[in-house]
From Swiss-Prot:
Source organism: Theromyzon tessulatum (Duck leech)
Name of the featured protein: Theromacin
GO BP term, example: defense response
Entry's localization field: Secreted
UniProt record similarity statement: Belongs to the macin family.
Amino acid sequence: MELKSGLSILLCFGICIAVINAGCFEDWSRCSPSTSRGTGVLWRDCDSYCKVCFKADRGECFDSPSLNCPQRLPNNKQCRCINARTAKDNRNPTCWA
């Protein structure tokens, strides 16, 4: 029962944060320095993401200042896939995030 309560609180907290910072998600990228701790654990790095999910030659991070959330995403970067050969592979769970 304790686990359910904890998960409920975590879910509510996540929803509140998402609503408050709805624009932040649009600017976020796997290259964003502020979320780099999750790279390789929660999501693929840019190069791997592009190669596996788009069959691209490579992926690279480039400077992309946050328009919606500059206070939360300073020095923001975005991932760009070079020579992507396919649409995103949504059947592969590692390509979802």
